Amino acid sequence: MNLTDRIALVTGGGRGIGRAVSILLASLGAEVVINYVNRPQAADETAAFIRQQGGKAESLGFDVARAGDVQAAVKDILARHARLDILVNNAGITRDGLLVKMKEEAWDAVLDTNLKGSFNCLKAVSRAMMKQRWGRIINITSVIGFTGNAGQVNYAAAKAGLLGLTKSAARELAPRGITVNGVAPGYIETEMTSGLPAEVSAGIMAAIPLKTLGKPDDVAGAVAYLASDSANYITGQVIHVNGGLYM
């Protein structure tokens, strides 16, 4: 796969899955803009690592949940790079809690970042990609968007919403040469899963046919494929990366 001279924006690109995606896209030749909102050190370190490996990367802070901030950031990227080819909507948070105890603030925070944030970014980049008549948009959803999960009604709703956003945007943007697809990770070795209680981890492992958690690089590989010319004829689809947890 060759992404030479492609300009890519990866939201939440400094840690976990986002970091793996940023590093892989850069290794394939893309110039990567690594977004962060409150952890500049992680984004800066990832960008520095990429540059040390001979790649091109920079960090850029903005809140995906704020439409005005997103529009300003995309305008800045276009002013400096003249184009924007790849968007990876990876930024996401959790605010877990049982339905009957969940506060409105927890619901709003997750929907604002995980769903509205993806919409904001998708909308902001679409016009530039339409002018280019080429673009790749990859939304990071989740197995939880398909199966649901007790204690995560907000997260599940946001990730399921991303599925509808992906398919509808794919239909709208296809005539302009833009593909929109999703990648749905299962349980991946990240900060989000490292704090799970032992009994919860054991239950998860028992449900995964491959009997192991995935790695961020597993997800990054699917993203890179969808961002490449190898996936020219794929749009409105979701690639599952879950070890067989959901079939």
Positions of PLM-derived features:
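Conserved glycine-rich cofactor-binding loop
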Residues: 7, 14-16
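Conserved glycine-rich Rossmann-like NAD(P)H-binding loop of the short-chain dehydrogenase/reductase
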Residues: 30-45
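Substrate-binding pocket helix/loop in short-chain dehydrogenase/reductase
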Residues: 98-99, 103-111, 193, 204
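Residue(s) in the substrate-gating loop at a strand-loop-helix junction
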Residues: 142
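C-terminal substrate-recognition "lid" of short-chain dehydrogenase/reductases
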Residues: 2, 122, 134, 178, ...
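Alpha-helical segment proximal to the catalytic Tyr-Lys
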Residues: 127, 171-175, 232
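Active-site helix of classical SDR
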Residues: 122, 158, 166
